[in-house]
């Protein structure tokens, strides 16, 4: 266990801490079914501490208004994550059974590299713009300004599939927008989150409370507390549709903004004039991490007249899919536990329709999910020295 160098503590109010009651739980390696280590089991009391820190940081520090500070902090964070990538890679494979090959792509390295997109967006984004004064039957001429402001305290609840990717897709845009964040990690893959806390603790430009990490067992009490608490402004949740409904119901009591990425897989549709030998090669992606991914096609629709031909091609494809030890870089299938992810880009909005979700991650649209839009009307004769007359 010691060779993994995994972080077992929570990250609350700028410090790595044990759970308040000292409780821990085992992290089980799905490949060997042996205990790989332990991690802190956060309670409702720990959730309260994290929310108090996040609320205090948002209201009392300059995090939400100091763009330069956020850029420095996120640059430090990105560089710190790159520096620990080799340790983190071993931890991810041990806790999730994710084939190590995928950690050199979307399940680790490229997700960290995608922080650059948020940094570039933060550097160039117009948080304030003037709009034309079209006049009004009430009052005199005014300077009208549309301002984007950080939405507040964000609770991010992430799944065990592609944990590093989903963690970063939620927390980085939220932090870049000026929100403070409490990340509740999936109980099966806690080290994908605790490493974030360890690295954040070493970033001098993160004020205490800007980012917090909680790991817990699967009882549901901590999640229920976080989604219902009035100190929370935004909930970003990825998981099942059934749990998403409960999150939405809980959040509605205090009218929280709710972003839901829920269950749902689309079929691969093959038309009757397709070259099946080429078209069906893509069906092999369902084997990545045994199909445990929301973007992996688990259904295939082919013309009835070409059914037998399709089955023969698929049989040949699947016989050649490499599987086994996830530490072997040649394998794309490990044990049943965690997800592979494909077709993502940092600048491409991703999300569900209908019952598969609300809101978007990635791209400008994902960034703006964590901003509030306000319009200010400042009379033309308003004193220029007033704070209201100054740009954001």
Predicted regions and their residues:
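N-terminal Rossmann-like NAD(P)+-binding subdomain of aldehyde/semialdehyde dehydrogenases
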Residues: 1-142
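Rossmann-like NAD(P) dinucleotide-binding subdomain of oxidoreductase/dehydrogenase enzymes
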Residues: 129-278
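Structural signal for hydrophobic packing residues in well-ordered secondary-structure cores
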Residues: 58, 62, 78-85, 89-92, ...
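C-terminal segments
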Residues: 109, 114-124, 286-291, 331, ...
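Residue-level signal for inorganic ion chemistry
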Residues: 33, 70, 92, 178, ...
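Short amphipathic alpha-helical segments
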Residues: 63, 74, 168-169, 194-195, ...
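ALDH superfamily catalytic-core signature
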Residues: 234, 242-334, 338, 382-392
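Gly/Ser/Thr-rich beta-alpha loop segments that engage phosphate groups in nucleotides
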Residues: 16, 99, 154, 230, ...
């Amino acid at each position: 266990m010691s060779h993994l160098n995994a972080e077992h503590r929570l990250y609350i109010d700028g410090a790595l801490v044990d759970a308040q009651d000292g409780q821990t739980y085992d992290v089980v390696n799905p490949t060997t079914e042996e205990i790989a280590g332990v991690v802190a089991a956060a309670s409702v009391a720990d959730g309260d501490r994290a929310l108090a820190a996040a609320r205090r940081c948002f209201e009392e520090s300059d995090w939400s208004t100091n763009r330069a500070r956020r850029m420095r902090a996120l640059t430090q964070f990105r560089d710190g994550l790159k520096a620990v990538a080799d340790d983190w890679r071993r931890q991810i494979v041990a806790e999730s059974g994710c084939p190590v090959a995928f950690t050199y792509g979307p399940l680790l390295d490229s997700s960290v590299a995608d922080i650059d997109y948020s940094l570039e967006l933060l550097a160039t984004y117009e948080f304030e713009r003037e709009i034309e004064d079209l006049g009004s039957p009430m009052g005199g001429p005014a300077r009208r300004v549309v301002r984007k402001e950080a939405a507040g305290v964000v609770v991010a609840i992430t799944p065990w599939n592609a944990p590093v990717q989903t963690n970063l897709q939620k927390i980085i845009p939220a932090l870049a927008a000026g929100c403070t964040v409490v990340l509740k990690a999936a109980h099966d893959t806690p080290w994908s989150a605790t490493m974030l806390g360890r690295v954040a603790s070493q970033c001098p430009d993160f004020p205490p409370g800007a980012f917090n990490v909680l790991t817990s067992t699967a009882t549901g009490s901590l999640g229920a507390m976080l989604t219902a608490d009035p100190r929370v402004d935004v909930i970003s949740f990825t998981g099942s549709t059934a749990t998403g409904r409960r999150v939405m119901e809980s959040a509605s009591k205090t009218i929280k903004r709710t972003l839901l990425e829920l269950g749902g897989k689309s079929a691969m549709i093959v038309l009757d004039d397709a070259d099946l030998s080429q078209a069906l090669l893509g069906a092999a992606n369902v084997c990545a991490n045994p199909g445990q991914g929301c973007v992996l096609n688990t259904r295939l629709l082919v013309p009835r007249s070409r059914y037998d031909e399709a089955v023969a091609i698929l049989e040949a494809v699947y016989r050649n899919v490499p599987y086994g030890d996830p530490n072997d870089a040649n394998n794309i299938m490990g044990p049943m536990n965690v997800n592979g992810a494909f077709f993502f880009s940092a600048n491409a909005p991703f999300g569900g329709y209908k019952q598969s979700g609300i809101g978007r991650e990635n791209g400008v649209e994902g960034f703006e999910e964590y901003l509030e839009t306000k319009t200010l009307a400042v009379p033309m004769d308003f004193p220029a020295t007033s704070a209201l007359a100054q740009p954001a």
